C-alpha cells in the first residue's frame, strides 16, 4: 500500500462519497406522507436574501462583479455584506497637515454603484478604523489586508465622519433607496476585530455614537448590532440600548457550524455541528423575545456549513443537503441568514492559491460554479408557502400558481461517510391528481459537481478560461425528466448527501 500515490483529501472524500452514494442494493422505502391540502405558513426565502463576500475593495474587480450577477440572477440574492468600507485602501478618511478631516467617497461610490447596477443592495458593515482616526495605530488585525481595529481617537471626528458618510449616501442615491439598506456597526467586537478595552463597554460606546448620528441624519436609516461572533452579547446589547434609549432597528450576530458548543452556548452539551447554527439562532430568537424590544428582526450576518477541516466540505455537494436541513430547522426563527460567502474572491488569508481549497464561496476562483452554487439554485425553486409536514428530511412548499415544490435530502456528516448509505423514500400524495408527471432535479456526485472534470484535466492550479468553461459545462444540471406518479406515490432513492427537488403540478 505504501507504494501507491497518495490522493489529496478532497479527492479521497469525493471518491468515498461517490462509492457510498451508489445504490448497491435497494434499501426498503421509508414512507413520507405529503398532503397538498395541508395548512400553510409563509416561507420567505431567508437563506438566499443576503450573502457575505470578500472585503469592500474587492467588489471593484471584474470577477467579483460577474459572480455577483450569477448569484443574483440564479439564486435571488438581494443584499451583500462585506468588511472594510472604511479601510484606508478605500480612501474615505484622511487628515491634512492641521489635523482636519478630509473625506473622499470616490471608491465608495464605485463600490455601491456596482452593486446597485446588478440589482443588489449593500448591507453596510461600518468597519474598520481609518489609521489616522485610530486611537491605537498599531492595533492591526492579522488578516492579509491588515485592517486597524482600534476605537477612534476622537469621537467628535468619528461622529463627523458618520454624518458625512450618511449625508453623502442620501445625496447620491436618495433617502427612498438608502432607507432600504441596513447599517451594521462593526464586525465581531467580542473577539480580535475590536481592540477596545474593556471590549463590551467600548463597543457600546461606538454603537451609541454611530446609531445616534445616523438617526440624526435621517430617522429612516436602519441601524443595528452587535454583530458579534458565536452569538454573544445579544441580551446585554438590548438591555443597554433600552436603558440608554439608543436607536436599534435590528439585531445581528454570527454563528458557524464549526463554532464550539462551549463558545456558542456556554455549555458542554453534545450538539452535532449540523445542528449548531439553527440551535444558536433559536437561542438568540428567544433572547430577543425576552428583551425590552421583543419585535426586532434577527439577521444572522455570517454562517456556513461545517468545514470538516481538510475534508473541504464546502467544495463538494454536501452543502446542498446541509443547507436544506438548515432551512427546515431555522424557518420561523430568523429574518435573514447571510451565507459567508457568495464567491471565493476573498483574501483574508492571502491570495487564493488554487480553485478548490475549501473556500467559503459558492463560486470558486475564476468563476467555477461549485456544488454549493447548484444546491442554492435548486432551493431557490421552493415556493413561498410552506405546507405542514412532520418529516425531518422534507420541505414541502407551494408556489403562487399552486405547484408543489418539495426538497428531499439524505444528509450524512463527512466524518461518518463510511457508515452512511443511500435511502429510498416513497412519497404518498393526497390532494393531487392520479397519474400526473413530476419533475425531479438533484445535486450529488454526478450532478452539479465540477470536481470529477477538474480531476480529469489534471487538477490545474491555474485553469485557463477554456478549462473554466469546460468545468462549468460539465457541472451544469441536466434537464429533468418527467416521472409519472404511480397510484399517487413516488419512489425516489437518495444516495449519500443528495439533494433532490421534486416539482408537482396540482392543476
Over which residues does each language-model region extend?
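Glycan-recognition surfaces
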Residues: 247-264, 274-278, 317-347, 366-382
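Active-site clefts of carbohydrate-active enzymes
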Residues: 258-268, 285-321, 344, 349-363
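Substrate-binding cleft/loops of secretory-pathway carbohydrate-active enzymes
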Residues: 227-252, 303-322, 326-327, 331, ...
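Conserved radical SAM core fold
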Residues: 57-58, 86-92, 131, 186-193, ...
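Aromatic- and acid-rich polysaccharide-binding/catalytic face
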Residues: 162, 179-181, 185-187, 221, ...
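Short, well-ordered amphipathic alpha-helical segments that serve as non-catalytic structural scaffolds
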Residues: 165, 278-287
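Non-catalytic accessory regions flanking glycosidase/transglycosidase catalytic cores in CAZymes
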Residues: 16, 23-182, 197-230, 244-246, ...
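Bacterial N-terminal signal peptides that target proteins for export
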Residues: 1-12
Amino acid at each position: 500500500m505504501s507504494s501507491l500515490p497518495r490522493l489529496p483529501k478532497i479527492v479521497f472524500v469525493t471518491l468515498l462519497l461517490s462509492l457510498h452514494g451508489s445504490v448497491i442494493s435497494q434499501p426498503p422505502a421509508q414512507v413520507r406522507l405529503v398532503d397538498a391540502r395541508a395548512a400553510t405558513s409563509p416561507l420567505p426565502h431567508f437563506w438566499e436574501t443576503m450573502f457575505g463576500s470578500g472585503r469592500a475593495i474587492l467588489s471593484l474587480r471584474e470577477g467579483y462583479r460577474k459572480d455577483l450577477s450569477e448569484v443574483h440572477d440564479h439564486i435571488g440574492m438581494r443584499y451583500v455584506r462585506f468588511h472594510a468600507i472604511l479601510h484606508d485602501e478605500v480612501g474615505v478618511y484622511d487628515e491634512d497637515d492641521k489635523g482636519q478631516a478630509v473625506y473622499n467617497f470616490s471608491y465608495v461610490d464605485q463600490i455601491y454603484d456596482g452593486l446597485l447596477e446588478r440589482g443588489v443592495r449593500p448591507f453596510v458593515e461600518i468597519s474598520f478604523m481609518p489609521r489616522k482616526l485610530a486611537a491605537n495605530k498599531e492595533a492591526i488585525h492579522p488578516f492579509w489586508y491588515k485592517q486597524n481595529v482600534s476605537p477612534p481617537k476622537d469621537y467628535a471626528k468619528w461622529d463627523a465622519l458618520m454624518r458625512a458618510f450618511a449625508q453623502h449616501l442620501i445625496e447620491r442615491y436618495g433617502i427612498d433607496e438608502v432607507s432600504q439598506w441596513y447599517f451594521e456597526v462593526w464586525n465581531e467586537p467580542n473577539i480580535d476585530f475590536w481592540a477596545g478595552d474593556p471590549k463590551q463597554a467600548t463597543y457600546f460606546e461606538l454603537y451609541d455614537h454611530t446609531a445616534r448620528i445616523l438617526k440624526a441624519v435621517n430617522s429612516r436609516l436602519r441601524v443595528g448590532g452587535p454583530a458579534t461572533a458565536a452569538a454573544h452579547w445579544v441580551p446585554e446589547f438590548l438591555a443597554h440600548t433600552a436603558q440608554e434609549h439608543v436607536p436599534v432597528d435590528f439585531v445581528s450576530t454570527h454563528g458557524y457550524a464549526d463554532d464550539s458548543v462551549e463558545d456558542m452556548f456556554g455549555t458542554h452539551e453534545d450538539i452535532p455541528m449540523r445542528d449548531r447554527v439553527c440551535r444558536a439562532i433559536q437561542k438568540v430568537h428567544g433572547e430577543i423575545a425576552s428583551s425590552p424590544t421583543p419585535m426586532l428582526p434577527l439577521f444572522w450576518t455570517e454562517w456556513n456549513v461545517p468545514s470538516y477541516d481538510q475534508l473541504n466540505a464546502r467544495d463538494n455537494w454536501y452543502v446542498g443537503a446541509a443547507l436544506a436541513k438548515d432551512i427546515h430547522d431555522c424557518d420561523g426563527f430568523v429574518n435573514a441568514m447571510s451565507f459567508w460567502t457568495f464567491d471565493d474572491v476573498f483574501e483574508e488569508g492571502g491570495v487564493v492559491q488554487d480553485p478548490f481549497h475549501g473556500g467559503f464561496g459558492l463560486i470558486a476562483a475564476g468563476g467555477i460554479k461549485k456544488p454549493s452554487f447548484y444546491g442554492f439554485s435548486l432551493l431557490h425553486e421552493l415556493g413561498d408557502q410552506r405546507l405542514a409536514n412532520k418529516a425531518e428530511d422534507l420541505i414541502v412548499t407551494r408556489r403562487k400558481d399552486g405547484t408543489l415544490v418539495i426538497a428531499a435530502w439524505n444528509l450524512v456528516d463527512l466524518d461518518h461517510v463510511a457508515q452512511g448509505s443511500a435511502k429510498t423514500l416513497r412519497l404518498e400524495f393526497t390532494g393531487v391528481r392520479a397519474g400526473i408527471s413530476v419533475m425531479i432535479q438533484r445535486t450529488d456526485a454526478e450532478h452539479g459537481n465540477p470536481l470529477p472534470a477538474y480531476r480529469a484535466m489534471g487538477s490545474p492550479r491555474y485553469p485557463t478560461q477554456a478549462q473554466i468553461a469546460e468545468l462549468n459545462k460539465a457541472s451544469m444540471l441536466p434537464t429533468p425528466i418527467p416521472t409519472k406518479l404511480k397510484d399517487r406515490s413516488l419512489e425516489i432513492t437518495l444516495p449519500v448527501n443528495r439533494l433532490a427537488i421534486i416539482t408537482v403540478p396540482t392543476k
